[in-house]
Amino acid sequence: MSLYRTFTANDAVEYARQFGGVSQPQTLVAAEEIGDGNLNLVFKIKDETGVSRVIVKQALPYVRCVGESWPLTLDRARIEAETLLTHARFCPQHTVTVLYHDPELAVMVQEDLSDHRIWRSELVKGADYPQAAAQLGEYLAQTLFHTSDFHQHPHEKKAAVSQFTNPELCQITEDLFFTDPYIEHERNQFDAALTPDVQALRDDKALKLAVAGLKHGFLSKAEALLHGDIHSGSIFVAEGRLKAIDAEFGFYGPIGFDVGTAIGNLLLNYCGLPGLLAPREAAAGRERRLEDIRTLWQTFSARFLALSDNESRDPALAESGYAALFLQQVWRDAVGYCGTELIRRTIGLAHVADLDSIQETEARLACQRHAISLGRTLVLAAPHIADVDALLARVRQSGA
């Protein structure tokens, strides 16, 4: 019989007292439910002075924004905890610390990051964290290299692919990225004024063939242990610091998916800034986003190459020049997945504040159309966008 039960605030406090690693656990007295996501309960556990000390996160057996009609496996809580623990082995400075996890209760205790801010919220406000892009590139390089065939022993990797098999969460990604936006589906959400733009996507045979190729890669390329949902809403930032959270979509997949999703969220902000800020501030913010993209890719690729030079364990993959060739394919994949992120975040189920928080209707629609158009361009042109400079040139040419 399952021991699972949905936590109340009191349950969360008691659990944190037992497993939060706090020196005086009896000082933990209150829980504040802060979860604004779709899949989990999240509690801040506070002491007698009102200071939040640890986080208790519990997976729900259904998609929260839909309800019990969309059930979900609780095993995703184990996968999230084990993904974060694995990533923390290789990049502890940029991975949230897991203090304890219990697969049966689908619950995890994490370090409190109240002194950090969600990166997306900061980007929407126009706040700049100039170190964040390089730190995200470092996180991606360390976690993806060390769980790839370059570094991981083949026997260990094959076992890990099984350990992190995540079919239900992958199904969500497969549907939301590669299927729903290109068909009529009840999960899709967009303003009626965008109907002609959406229909044009659905009628675009070349686009749908390119998306099919990206989906096929997502299904078949077990290249490394991905975060699986690495957008600006799953990243905490503070001055000089960055931490990745929310890894329940973790699985072994194409490295370009994580890289492309990260770049895509910077481009979503780029598309939204003219509707969020005054013209001069928006223009300056856009230049910072493009520089963030350049920094992210250059940091990721340089670190991945350095790691491959020094830590590759497979003698064939360690051949001089091979890692650079491999990264060319990662780059092409990343540009394509970036495009699908732009499209699905604009017309699919899970939208972003970078676009949806724009108050003026015509400005919001213009920014959304830009995201759709740019996403289409990147999916189609990915094989021909040779490097990050070419990508930034395409973005600048995209107008709006």
UniProtKB/Swiss-Prot annotation:
Signal peptide: none annotated. One of its GO terms (biological process) is L-methionine salvage from methylthioadenosine. ATP binds at N40, K57, E111, D112, L113, D246, A247, E248. This is Methylthioribose kinase. It catalyses: 5-(methylsulfanyl)-D-ribose + ATP = 5-(methylsulfanyl)-alpha-D-ribose 1-phosphate + ADP + H(+). Pathway: Amino-acid biosynthesis; L-methionine biosynthesis via salvage pathway; S-methyl-5-thio-alpha-D-ribose 1-phosphate from S-methyl-5'-thioadenosine (hydrolase route): step 2/2. GO terms for molecular function: ATP binding; S-methyl-5-thioribose kinase activity. Keywords: Amino-acid biosynthesis, ATP-binding, Kinase, Methionine biosynthesis, Nucleotide-binding, Transferase. Its EC number is 2.7.1.100. Catalyzes the phosphorylation of methylthioribose into methylthioribose-1-phosphate. The gene is mtnK. Pfam families: APH. Substrate binds at D229, R344. Homodimer. Belongs to the methylthioribose kinase family.
